[in-house]
UniProtKB/Swiss-Prot annotation:
Residues 1-26 form the signal peptide. GO terms for biological process: Golgi to endosome transport; Golgi to vacuole transport; protein targeting to vacuole. It comes from Colletotrichum graminicola (strain M1.001 / M2 / FGSC 10212). This is Vacuolar protein sorting/targeting protein 10. Functions as a sorting receptor in the Golgi compartment required for the intracellular sorting and delivery of soluble vacuolar proteins, like carboxypeptidase Y (CPY) and proteinase A. Executes multiple rounds of sorting by cycling between the late Golgi and a prevacuolar endosome-like compartment. Its main location: Golgi. The chain crosses the membrane at residues 1386-1406, 1436-1456. Residues 672-681 have a biased composition (Basic and acidic residues).
């Protein structure tokens, strides 16, 4: 079973089946009545313990009801026609149900649908949550949570409301920015242990106010409905991970008595599973270390668990032909042990697993017998290795497994992966009775060749019941079995039934010679009824559906008496006597199979009698990290020590730990006196999980490794770890290379280290690797191409390697594109050649794989490139969306222009052409930026798209002319705007240009900076500082009017996202205390600090700062009027984000950040200008106040590079060197000996202090409307950061001031600092503004000011400079305008609690959205334009932020039988198409107006592949 975040009362409550009936009665036969309808009856639900049934007509959006088990049906008249969008049954009250509409008025019943009352939710349903709109309290049926969405156009704010009176009054606002809220008491079995908490505790998955990414979601709890006390929301974050909360919460699910939370993080698809049985004490789910099992997204399934443990199946093979491993937890859901390997799964994550209802400890599972062949399967030739599947059964909850037997033959059964009906696959509440479809033999055959088998002893013995596959059901607690033969044709005209446990069968014809294709067969949830529903289909392509009611009440005249019953024992020994199962004997009273009577006890469930046994060896299993070895349990990993044991101990200290055995969870056996099998034994602390580390000795260690190569450089791929990863390695893959211009030669030696360079080993020695391509988003994954179609890859950090065959040979560029959310989705662009009539034609072809290369589908031919543009953070795009640059016609003719082509379904049916004569496109943050020819103006035009479907042309500032020679470079864009560099001087050696910045949809541009320096390849001296809002550095050309002189370059900084630029203030003296030749307090054009920038870096990834080192920057440069040569440069640093600088080293030193900014290492790197040699590094642990030297080698060497994890989180560094003898080697420098204590952030005794950035010209710390406080480690704290520090500690909003506004479009700043209309222009019109902002409801008459969207300042009307004029509705939005004028509690929440326009901040947006690359993208061709145009006076328009979305990946999918529509489609062969259940269409809206990326200083994760330079390849020829 797969869960979706909510517990359901019974498996049948969420199933879909229907019936309208007309009766035909025959003597000694069941009564059969047929109702014929136009549309499939979906979402059929029985009210528990009744014959009342509901179903939905999805097409007509109506609800139908029957109160006689489907004989007669009536449309529910209390609900208006065409309003019923979603039927939801109350999970804990068998008389209640709800029908949701698309609006805010919905319907409920408390009397099993006899009457329906309207209720108000206060917001429309949140369609992004599928069917999980309502969540019910298990102890009080009146308490209901409603997950809604407040939408305007495509913009949605996700909110949650609640009721404590079953919506008798209007729903109350609970919380905003939610991805789902849940009552803690969400199942009958779960309890917090306190009545008041059970009653009111609510847990919400909450998105970060400043981030749209799921990796920043958090779990927050409240015991008073998130109400405010003293203006502070009463909520707290549970300490899920020992003593702190966990980011990246994507889902929550209640499983029996456990509450599970799944978390995700950047760089990995490994998830963290956290479990609690009281919401107070949490544990991370721990899996055995012996086989390295991990819980990855989309690769694990929470099975139907027990009241005493959780069972999970984890996929461990290729996704296209998967198998899994099954685990069972201990009693608190924390420590999992392995039950069974090689379980059979399908690509949807369904597992062949089912428990026998009502009998503890028995379940059936299918395993793959030829698993070795399946695991080696490479799908060569398009054919997979066929699985040989065999069935197993366990009677001790997975400790041991046995074959199924029919007679003396082995029996194999079709299970969940071959689901043929709704409901459970095998069993029902009928004690001991099991039906299945299967076959005898060595392994499972085809479903169509299977027969029906029956067992009446809970699966111990089986016998054949019917020929061929059937759909089947149980009634009257097993007194009657009903079956209908399966068929893909409309040729079934009878049903079959048995009154003696399947020994004999009778037939009954359908009335009026009706012949159907059976779709499903069902009955009441508890299988106590004698009434059944059969749904069939006729009519071929114009189908009709028949709901057939079957009533067997007249077959037996009498009700069973005591003599008609027998004791049935769940387990018998070899002598036929009751034996112990899970520590007890279990006995049911059930009808004898030969008795000619019915129980007639509708809705009364069977109750077993149990008797506990004394414990034996059979009641124990191997404990966590122990594996069975004969009669013993052998240690296979570290041992769990009790809390607070071994924390400050020495390795040889001891504790009482596991003996290797544990009592099977749920086993009820009575312990004997004396020693027990699971008594703790003496263990050493060195054997424990998190064993004590060696104490810090205060020493730095260096380890050298020599590479036998003639090459002098290395291609280095650091595999970053995700926060949710259980790995602790620091893996690097390197190979020696040599760069020459834009080309690279590689030595075919590939090395791997798992410990950051202390030890190295060769990998892939027998393979001829051509290219190495790390996955852009999942850092555990790396691909290796060859000169053939063979592609090698690893998904576990180079631990194991696999291969697939690509559809074409790789071309000259990067052949792979990756999806940001789906690890296994790939696009391959390669070269294909066809020979026709002796002439060979070659072209590039794009192919798509959704299973990591096992299967490929051709997407397009004659393409230049394709990219996945779907992203979970952008719900306005389909997750499957792909955008390609391709030739308009499928040929290589010169006059064949390129176009943009998009698809939202992998090019299956949707294939849309956009624009013409396109030069290139680039992805940057949420934008798709396109450069196309403008034939009319003989130049280039820029276009942008947010949704990948609509491409709007860019409008440049007044008089901004773009000629055919202009070159566009898309710069790092991280504030919901395109930063576009346009070259204005194109003479070689003199190139520079302007940076213009777009509005929120990428279409309207204004000036940000002019005369910005670029090199001859149009790379630009522009860099945003990661981790902080609004800080950027540029280099400008000061002497642009003197074309015959070399460039005079100056450095400038912006602290407000490019609205203003200033020089860097020079330090007063150098590191030796000597004054500089000039001085300036703030920096000016005559005296300032100037830094060597992006265009001069041999490695473009060497940035001034790292996001984890908040506020710290280093640079090489000089003090003076302009930038001097690198040979004359010294090294400078700042600790306050560039407001003040100091000289720390003479000469140009290169730097790396470690331990999240707590360690900075400098070394003198050799360059052509300065071929220096050294043997020393210099480091600081106190933000540069003091520096210490360390000799990493005995003699001076040439340092080629220094590297570490790009996130700056490691305490290890690698120095790459070459000695005088030409030998190339690396030196690992390990700083872990400096500290052995993890830093604490406890209030009162914290190792951190709070630091706030500021603007140098503003008196307070308000920047962009708020004061941000960041955590930084104290200088004297002798500790290390053991987890990712949440640097952004808190944000407090300020009152709006003039600094929060800028001049509106077509306005310029006057001498009086007021915004005045540019002569000859007009203010933007209402029509134009509403057209450019299609989701806006209202328009304000222009005041000349507009709010800087980065600001979060709080306005009150009087201080809002952009709203001191009259508001008007946009055309067609008058009603919404009026509605929004009426302020509600929810409106106040959005206006105050979540400030308008929380803007994106600089740092990590680009790293997370632009394929993990850093750098710049060039579009189009080079050009020139007038540099004296009047637009240079325009202030920049900081952008209106565009919406992005946090994606809530489900923890696990719903139980196969719990999804109404999908269940019906799975058995009917339906599906496809798709669209929202609410809208009936596929147009999805997205969230939110208020969620934007904010730099928090903890996401400086940069790929090792450089930002691509995407130029015009002059109509490439292949």
């Amino acid at each position: 079973m797969r869960l979706r975040g909510k517990t359901v009362a019974s498996w049948r409550i969420l199933l879909s089946v229907l019936t309208l009936a007309a009766a035909v009665q025959a003597k000694d036969e069941p009564t059969i009545k047929v109702t014929t309808i136009k549309h499939p009856p979906l979402n059929l639900n029985y009210f528990e313990d009744s014959n009342t049934v509901l179903y939905q007509d999805i097409s007509e959006r109506n609800l139908y009801r029957s109160e006689d088990a489907g004989i007669t049906w009536d449309r529910v008249k209390d609900i208006p026609d065409n309003q019923a969008s979603l039927l939801t049954m109350h999970s804990f009250d068998k008389n209640r149900a709800y029908v949701l509409t698309q609006g805010t008025e919905h319907f409920k019943t408390t009397d099993r649908g006899k009457s329906w009352q309207k209720f108000s939710s206060g917001a429309p349903p949140n369609i992004f949550m599928g069917g999980d709109i309502l969540h019910f309290h298990a102890g009080d049926p009146d308490r209901v949570i409603f997950n809604g969405a407040d939408c305007i156009g495509i913009f949605c704010d996700l909110i949650t409301l609640y009721t404590t009176d079953n919506f008798k009054s209007k729903a109350k606002f609970l919380r905003g920015n939610t991805e789902g809220c849940y009552w803690a008491k969400s199942s009958d079995l779960f309890t917090t242990g306190k009545d008041d908490l059970d009653k009111q505790r609510i847990l919400c998955v909450v998105r970060d106010n400043f981030s749209p990414f799921k990796e920043d979601n958090r779990l927050l709890a409240s015991d008073n409905y998130f109400q405010k006390v003293d203006n502070k929301v009463q909520e707290f974050e549970p300490d899920m991970d020992t003593n702190h909360g966990v980011q990246g919460v994507v889902s929550l699910a209640v499983v029996k008595k456990y509450l599970m939370v799944a978390t995700s993080s950047l760089n990995t698809d490994e998830m963290g599973l956290f479990v609690t049985d009281d919401t107070i004490k949490w544990h991370r789910a721990m899996f055995p270390t012996s086989h390295g099992h991990k819980v990855n997204q989309g690769a694990y399934t929470v099975l139907e668990s027990t009241n005493y443990s959780i069972q999970i199946d984890v996929m461990n093979t290729r996704p296209s032909n998967p198998t899994g491993v099954m685990f069972t937890s201990n009693s608190n859901g924390t420590f999992f042990t392995e039950n069974l390997e090689h379980t059979n799964r399908n690509t949807n994550g369904h597992v062949d697993f089912e428990k026998i209802t009502g009998v503890q400890g028995i379940f059936m599972v299918n395993v793959v017998q030829n698993w070795e062949e399946v695991e080696k399967d490479t799908n060569r030739g398009g054919k997979h290795v066929q699985k040989e599947i065999v069935s197993k059964i366990t009677f001790d909850d997975g400790r041991t497994f046995h074959d199924l037997k029919s007679g003396g033959d082995q029996l194999h059964l079709h299970s969940v992966t071959d689901l043929d009906n709704v409901g459970r696959v095998f069993s029902s509440p009928a004690p001991g009775l099991v039906l299945a479809i299967g076959n005898k033999g060595k392994s499972l055959g085809k479903f169509g060749d299977g027969d029906v088998y029956v067992s009446d002893d809970a699966g111990v013995t089986w016998k054949k019941a019917l020929d061929g596959p059937h759909k089947y059901e149980f009634g009257d607690l097993g007194s009657i079995l009903v079956a209908v033969k399966d068929s893909h044709k409309e040729d079934i005209g009878e049903i079959r039934y048995s009154l003696d446990h399947g020994e004999s069968w009778k037939t009954a014809p359908l009335p009026d010679d009706l012949k159907i294709k059976p779709e499903l067969l069902t009955t009441t949830q508890d299988s106590t009824s004698l009434k059944f529903l059969l749904v069939g289909k006729t009519g071929g392509d114009n189908p009709k559906f028949h709901i057939i009611a079957l009533d067997f009440e007249g077959l037996h005249e009498r009700t069973c008496k005591e003599d008609d019953f027998e004791d049935w024992h769940a387990r018998l020994d070899e002598n036929g006597k009751p034996s112990c199962l899970m520590g007890h004997k279990q006995t049911y009273r059930r009808r004898k199979k030969t008795a000619d009577c019915f129980l007639n006890q509708e809705f009364k469930d069977p109750v077993p009698v149990t008797e506990d046994c004394e414990c034996t060896d059979a009641d124990f299993e191997c404990d966590y990290n122990f594996i069975r070895d004969g009669d013993n349990c052998k240690k296979a990993g570290p041992i769990i020590a009790p809390d607070n044991v071994c924390k400050n101990a020495r390795p040889d200290d001891t504790f009482k730990g596991s003996s290797g055995w544990r009592k099977i969870p749920g086993n009820t056996c009575k312990r004997k006196s004396g020693d027990q099998k699971d008594d703790p034994v003496e263990r050493k602390c060195s054997e424990a999980v998190n064993a004590p580390a060696a104490p810090a000795d205060g020493k730095i260690k260096a380890v050298q490794h020599v590479f036998k190569t003639d090459f002098k450089d290395f291609e280095k791929i650091y595999l970053e770890r995700g926060e949710s990863s259980t790995e602790v390695d620091e893996t690097i893959i390197v190979r020696p290379v040599e760069y020459s211009g834009n080309s690279m030669r590689a030595d075919n030696q590939i090395w791997r280290t798992k410990d950051h360079g202390k030890n190295w080993e060769r990998i892939l020695q027998d393979e001829d690797v051509r290219g190495i391509y790390p996955h852009s988003f999942f850092k555990d994954v790396v691909f290796f191409t060859t000169d053939s179609k063979k592609v090698l890859y690893t998904i576990d950090r180079a631990e194991h390697f696999h291969s697939f065959e690509a559809p074409t040979k790789p071309g000259s560029g990067n052949p792979l594109s990756f999806h940001p959310d789906k690890k296994d989705w790939l696009i391959w662009v390669g070269e294909k050649c066809e020979k026709v009539n002796g002439k060979e034609t070659c072209f590039t072809e794009a192919s798509i794989s959704r299973d990591r290369g096992d299967n490929w589908k051709t997407a397009m031919r004659y393409v230049q490139k394709c990219e996945f543009t779907g992203h979970s953070a952008y719900r306005y795009r389909d997750l499957r969306q792909i955008v390609c640059l391709a030739h308009k016609e499928e040929n290589n003719e010169k006059d064949n222009p390129k176009v943009i082509v998009s698809s939202n379904d992998f090019f299956d049916e949707d294939k849309t052409f956009h624009q013409d004569r396109v030069k290139n496109f680039a992805l940057m943050a949420e934008f798709i930026v396109v450069a196309a020819e403008d034939q009319e103006k003989q130049g280039l035009r820029a276009l942008a798209s947010l949704d990948g479907v609509s491409y709007a042309e860019a409008h440049f500032p007044v008089n901004f002319k773009v000629s055919h020679q202009n070159a566009y470079t898309v710069l790092d864009s991280s504030t919901h705007a395109v930063n576009l560099f346009v070259a204005t001087e194109t003479a070689e050696g003199r190139r520079y240009g302007s940076i213009i910045k777009s509005n929120s949809n990428g279409t309207s541009y204004v000036m940000s900076a002019q005369a910005v320096n670029c090199n001859d390849q149009y790379y630009v001296d522009f860099e945003k500082i990661p981790g902080l809002e609004g800080v950027a550095l540029i280099n400008t050309v000061a002497n642009r009017d003197k074309r015959n002189e070399p460039k005079k370059v100056q450095t400038q900084i912006s602290h407000n996202d490019g609205s203003q630029w200033a020089f860097l203030p020079p330090p007063k003296a150098d590191v030796d205390g000597k004054s500089y030749s000039c001085s300036s307090t703030e920096g000016d054009e005559k005296c300032a600090l100037h830094l060597h920038h992006y265009t001069e870096r041999s490695d473009k990834r060497k940035t001034f700062s790292a996001a984890t080192a908040v506020g710290l920057m280093f640079g090489n440069g000089n003090v003076g009027s302009s930038l001097s040569s690198l040979k004359e440069a010294d090294t400078f640093m700042t600790t306050d984000a560039g407001i003040t600088w100091k000289n720390v080293k003479k000469g140009a030193w290169t730097w790396q950040y470690g331990d999240q900014g707590s360690i900075v290492v400098l070394v003198q790197r050799a360059s052509r200008e300065n071929p220096v040699k050294t043997k020393m590094i210099s480091y600081t642990t106190d933000e540069g106040k003091t520096w210490k030297d360390f000799a990493f080698t005995d003699k001076e060497v040439t340092v080629l590079d220094i590297s570490t994890l790009r996130s700056g989180a490691s305490r290890n560094f690698l120095i790459w060197c070459k000695d005088d003898g030409g030998e190339t080697f690396s030196v690992n420098v390990d700083f872990t000996g400096l500290a052995d204590r993890p830093c604490k952030s406890d209030e009162g005794s914290s190792d951190y202090y709070l630091w706030s950035p500021k603007h140098p010209s503003q008196p307070d710390n308000c920047l962009f409307g708020h004061v941000s406080q960041y955590l930084r480690k104290k200088d004297d704290a002798n500790c290390y950061n053991d987890a990712r520090v949440q640097h952004l500690y808190q944000v407090e909003n300020c009152t709006c001031t003039r600094a929060d506004y800028e001049c509106d479009y077509n306005y310029e700043l006057g001498t009086d600092k007021q915004c005045k209309l540019v002569p000859g222009t007009s203010p933007i019109s209402a029509e134009q503004w509403c057209k450019e902002n299609p989701d806006a409801v209202e328009y304000y008459e222009p005041t000349g000011f507009r709010r800087i969207p980065l600001t979060t300042c709080i306005g009150n009307g009087h201080n809002e400079l952009d709203k001191q004029s009259k508001a008007h509705p946009c055309a067609g939005k008058e009603d919404e305008f009026e509605r929004r004028r009426r302020t509600s509690g929810i409106a106040i929440f959005f206006a105050v609690v979540i400030p308008f326009g929380l803007a994106g901040a600089i740092g990590w947006w680009v790293y997370r959205n632009w394929n993990g690359k850093i750098g710049q993208i060039r579009l189009g061709e080079s050009s020139s334009l007038d540099n004296d145009a009047p637009w240079v006076k325009y202030p920049v328009i900081a952008l209106s932020a565009v919406v992005a979305v946090a994606a809530a990946l489900p923890l696990v999918a719903s139980a196969l039988w719990r999804r109404a529509t999908s269940a019906y489609e799975s058995v009917s062969g339906g599906g496809g198409g798709g669209g929202s259940w609410l809208s009936g269409r596929g147009n999805r809206r997205f969230t939110t107006r208020d969620s934007f990326a904010r730099g928090r200083g903890d996401y400086a994760v940069v790929d090792d592949d450089e930002g691509e330079l995407l130029g015009d390849d002059s109509d490439e020829e292949v």
